[in-house]
Amino acid sequence: MIIKNITNLLQVTSMRDFFAYIYNSRKINRVELLRLLKWQNYGLVVRLKAGFKETDIEHFARCLNLNDDEIEIFIKVS
């Protein structure tokens, strides 16, 4: 699957890769964080929202184990 963002194209093969990218990148554009990304391979809808205070890397790990048809994951980038 491809994540299209403002600065580049990122190819990811799993949600774990995606979260690692988000966690490791400190240059993510705030406009990009408000985009709605559709994950065809997982049946998930991931809404990126800057500054959601209750999320952290442990929350990301818990989300990887969810099997819902559609979930919203709110990601904080510090």
Predicted regions and their residues:
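A short, Lys/Arg-rich alpha-helix, primarily the initiator
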Residues: 1-32
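Short alpha-helical DNA-recognition segment
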Residues: 26-46
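The DNA-recognition helices of helix-turn-helix-type DNA-binding domains
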Residues: 40, 51-52, 78
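Short amphipathic recognition helices of helix-turn-helix/homeodomain-type DNA-binding modules
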Residues: 71-78
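DNA major-groove recognition helix of helix-turn-helix
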Residues: 48-49, 56, 75
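Flexible coil/turn residues that form the inter-helical turn or adjacent wing/linker of helix-turn-helix
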Residues: 26, 50-53
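DNA major-groove recognition helix of helix-turn-helix/homeodomain DNA-binding modules
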Residues: 54-71
